[in-house]
Amino acid sequence: MSIDHSRISTQPFPASEKRYLGGSLFPEVRVPVRAITLSPTVEAFSGVTRTLPNPPLLVPDTSGAYTDPAVATDLQRGLPHARPWLARSERTEETARFSALADMDGPLPYPHVLTPRRARSESRGGQGITQMQAARRGEITPEMEFVALRENLRQQEQAELAHQHPGESFGASLPRLYTPEFVRDEVARGRAVIPANVNHPELEPTIIGRNFRVKINANLGTSIVTSSIEEEVEKMVWATRWGADTVMDLSTGRHIHQTREWIVRNSPVPIGTVPIYQALEKVDGKAEELTWEVYRDTLIEQAEQGVDYFTIHAGVRLAHVPLTARRRTGIVSRGGSILAKWCLAHHQENFLYTRFAEICEIMAAYDVTFSLGDGLRPGSIEDANDAAQFAELGTLGELTRVAWDHGVQTMIEGPGHVPMQLIRENMTRQLDVCQEAPFYTLGPLTTDIAPGYDHITSAIGAAQIAWYGTAMLCYVTPKEHLGLPDKQDVRDGVITYKIAAHAADLAKGHPGAQARDNAISKARFEFRWQDQFNLALDPEKARALHDETLPADAAKTAHFCSMCGPAFCSMKLSHDIRAGDVLAGLEAKAREFRELGGEIYVEGSDD
């Protein structure tokens, strides 16, 4: 059996060219960006027409090699390696074999499996391989230069679009220009993470932290009820095409290991998982039969595959479980409920908490990033900001310090369902308790009354909490609470969350954030319809909606749309007013010249 390549989206975006920004410290660094070609501005005045060029606009590109016509992608072999330096690292070594060879068999085994690497025993501790350990040693890694270039997008070359309103960053330290040294310092402090497992060479690195552009994550994965490996690979490529900065594989059905192998080998973005899901499958879905040994082996096998970050619900402690008893919706996190059940069945402390130092050692050996899970997040706005939620947050702050002591990069997961007036408290508490480790939130949803529209109810809260300081937003699709999302749901969720993240970047004053807004506003005022479509987050939808009422080619140069028509277009009227003001001004100056006798030089008065 093989995956149908024709279902994978490889068409470049309209009027767009894949470009690569080269590293100066590390020549092998090639950072992908999308250059949107813009048509020229045409000015007509008093019968004279002049054409002014508009330079291409550079925007972030998470789509990988799939949108590069120069690269022939093959899902059977995986993406080209974007980090070739990994194979030459003297601090890592190849392992003798995989820890989970038996699980590679089945209906769709991956044909080209990489030999896994891990830190050499002598390279652990202070000389370890994680981005945090390197940063603390004062080293700038290729990944650090990569993300610095990715954040900047050569904004200094787009001066015409540089106007930007001052932002309110709520204490964030946004630089005017991102340098590899700034990145190194943020990673060393724990305020940013670069999820980049040494076994994911296909990865194009990204950085997550409140002093950087707000990132978004897309969830996907098989379930016991529906979906397949083929569908999930297709959705991963689809999500990254539309702008997902990371992807989480939340597969809970059969063949979890194989599904993940196909996804990781073909993913240009960091991949996250919740290892407890696969561990539970290994004990036939019986939470009380979970053991540390089963979970440990699952961590290692996923780290060997190249998973970049793990959601680990080590903050769900035995003493916290009774705090959820009076909740309207109890424990809504799958991982949280699994571990709560284990704690109660054994009346013991959560083994992820008691074994946390050992988990850190595994993470450090492969440079896997922690995403400390919020297993007690509120599942309804009635339960928001309650004792259970904040008790777990306190434990996550404690575990963050332990992870940092082991040199492991760490981010913190957050809610959930929170009404607008309670959102800021979540951010201020997290910054304080977790020492500014990056916050990664699911929304939050600001109301519970809109099933089918929860991508909107959550985007409201997502934009707000990202403005306050959340570093990454986990998308919510229209299918939230209703079913497994399909491709269209993934697209809607990603675009909605790109809007929320961008709105937060604007509000914070992220350098260069307003350039795309300025470019599309300029195109709109100049009736450059094709440029408006091409600059949009979803060019296809923008063009399709315009075509519904004005499909003719001539309508793409018209100075009106179907909303106002030719007689009432406000922007056309603004053009007329400006032209009239210019003519009136010229006529006034001509009249003044004649009244002064037509002399080129006029003598000034003696007084």
Swiss-Prot record:
Its EC number is 4.1.99.17. One of its GO terms (biological process) is thiamine diphosphate biosynthetic process. This is Phosphomethylpyrimidine synthase. Its cofactor is [4Fe-4S] cluster. Substrate binds at residues 219, 248, 277, 313, 333-335, 374-377, 413, 440. It catalyses: 5-amino-1-(5-phospho-beta-D-ribosyl)imidazole + S-adenosyl-L-methionine = 4-amino-2-methyl-5-(phosphooxymethyl)pyrimidine + CO + 5'-deoxyadenosine + formate + L-methionine + 3 H(+). One of its GO terms (molecular function) is 4 iron, 4 sulfur cluster binding. [4Fe-4S] cluster binds at residues 561, 564, 569. PANTHER family: PHOSPHOMETHYLPYRIMIDINE SYNTHASE, CHLOROPLASTIC (PTHR30557:SF1), THIAMINE BIOSYNTHESIS PROTEIN THIC (PTHR30557). One of its GO terms (cellular component) is cytosol. HAMAP family: ThiC. It comes from Deinococcus radiodurans (strain ATCC 13939 / DSM 20539 / JCM 16871 / CCUG 27074 / LMG 4051 / NBRC 15346 / NCIMB 9279 / VKM B-1422 / R1). Keywords: 4Fe-4S, Iron, Iron-sulfur, Lyase, Metal-binding, S-adenosyl-L-methionine, Thiamine biosynthesis, Zinc. Gene3D superfamilies: 6.10.250.620, Radical SAM ThiC family, central domain. Binds 1 [4Fe-4S] cluster per subunit. The cluster is coordinated with 3 cysteines and an exchangeable S-adenosyl-L-methionine. Catalyzes the synthesis of the hydroxymethylpyrimidine phosphate (HMP-P) moiety of thiamine from aminoimidazole ribotide (AIR) in a radical S-adenosyl-L-methionine (SAM)-dependent reaction. Pathway: Cofactor biosynthesis; thiamine diphosphate biosynthesis.
